[in-house]
């Protein structure tokens, strides 16, 4: 009975987007659902509108039907399932800081990025702490995860490659796993993409002639290239080892691209923060609106308020609606 009640709560939060003229077409965006959160900042686990976030900013897959959320001002990592159930994995708003150990007592300072592996490891880009953290499943540990620092110098910003725990970052904003177990992060204060591999940090792009302005998020494309949302240049950049930076979407099409994701068909999705929309970009560069209304922030059925991240997972396009303190989604393939 309780499960059915909670499912109805999540389904009842579905909200239909208004018809919006999309760039390159006239079709209305698909329906957008509010999965969890109510538009009010706070900290609470629960189901649907009972849950509270305070600036949810990044997303990652978490099992077959849920996502992880980095919740900035709650200094925590949360999970959200498709039925709207929210629980805290690690951190808490009253535990800002840097402390490793069991997830139940670990401390984070404004976690911005989160990335997961199939075997359950969770990487966290801690923007204010200037570190990369790792959560590993461990039986008998309070909270179920052990938290360790894998790169960076806690509380100290800078730009230094080398041994991981001696390296320095300046506000890492995302965490993306490579096939070889490396962790990639856009280091926005240094305008570079950094990598942690085998205990060593190096800069893979952004230095020399490969200049970026404000690399905010990264994702893997189907052809193995890394796509970078450069919010400062209003561009999507692409990178492959041994090649110079490329450009995927022409300048003028985007307005502060803050998050990027790739669908199974190769479609790119962008959380275009300043335009208040989520966009889809196909292989030919055609741009369409998936959610939101251009230039209009709001919290009603048709609007977003500074969309920060997107993720394709479990048949949905998930959206971190930053200033509405909620997680939304669009069902794909309809």
Residue positions per predicted region:
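Conserved beta-propeller blade signature
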Residues: 66-68, 121-123, 182-184, 225-227, ...
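Gly/Pro-rich loop segments of beta-rich domains
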Residues: 29-55, 85-110, 143-171, 200-216, ...
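Short loop/turn segments immediately following the C-termini of beta-strands
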Residues: 72, 127, 137, 188, ...
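Blade-level signature of beta-propeller repeat domains, shared across WD40, Kelch, NHL, RCC1
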Residues: 306-334
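Bacterial Sec-dependent signal peptides at the C-terminal "C-region" and cleavage site
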Residues: 15-30
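A short loop-to-beta-strand structural motif that recurs across blades of beta-propeller domains
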Residues: 75-78, 85, 130-134, 146, ...
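Short loop/turn segments that connect beta-strands within beta-propeller blades
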Residues: 80-85, 136-141, 196-200, 239-244, ...
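Residue-level detector of Asp-centered blade-edge/turn motifs that repeat once per structural unit
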Residues: 61-64, 116-119, 177-180, 220-223, ...
């Amino acid at each position: 009975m309780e499960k059915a009640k909670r499912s109805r709560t999540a389904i009842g939060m579905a909200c239909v987007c208004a018809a919006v003229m999309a760039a390159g077409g006239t079709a209305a965006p698909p329906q957008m659902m509010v999965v969890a959160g109510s538009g009010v900042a706070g900290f609470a686990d629960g189901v649907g509108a009972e849950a509270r976030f305070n600036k949810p900013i990044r997303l990652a897959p978490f099992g077959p039907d849920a996502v992880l959320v980095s919740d900035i001002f709650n200094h925590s990592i949360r999970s959200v399932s498709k039925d709207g159930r929210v629980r805290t994995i690690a951190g808490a708003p009253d535990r800002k800081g840097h402390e490793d150990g069991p997830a139940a007592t670990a401390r984070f300072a404004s976690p911005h990025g989160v990335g997961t592996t199939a075997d359950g490891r969770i990487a966290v880009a801690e923007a204010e702490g200037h570190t990369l953290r790792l959560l590993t499943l461990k039986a008998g540990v309070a909270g179920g995860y052990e938290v360790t620092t894998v790169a960076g110098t806690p509380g100290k910003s800078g730009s230094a490659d080398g041994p991981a725990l001696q390296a320095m970052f300046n506000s890492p904003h995302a965490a993306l796993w490579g096939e070889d177990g490396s962790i990639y992060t856009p280091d926005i204060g240094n305008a570079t993409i950094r990598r942690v591999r085998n205990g060593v940090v190096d800069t893979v792009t952004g230095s020399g002639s490969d200049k970026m302005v404000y690399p905010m998020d990264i994702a893997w494309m189907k052809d193995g290239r890394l796509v970078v949302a450069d919010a400062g240049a209003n561009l999507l950049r692409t990178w492959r080892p041994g090649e110079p930076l490329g450009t995927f979407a022409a300048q003028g099409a985007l307005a502060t691209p803050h998050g990027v994701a790739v669908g199974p068909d190769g479609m790119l999705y962008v959380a275009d923060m300043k335009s208040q929309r989520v966009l889809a970009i196909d292989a030919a560069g055609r741009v369409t609106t998936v959610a939101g209304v251009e230039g209009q922030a709001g919290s009603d059925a048709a609007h977003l308020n500074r969309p920060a991240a997107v993720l394709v997972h479990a048949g949905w396009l998930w959206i971190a609606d930053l200033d509405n303190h909620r997680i939304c989604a669009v069902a794909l393939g309809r």
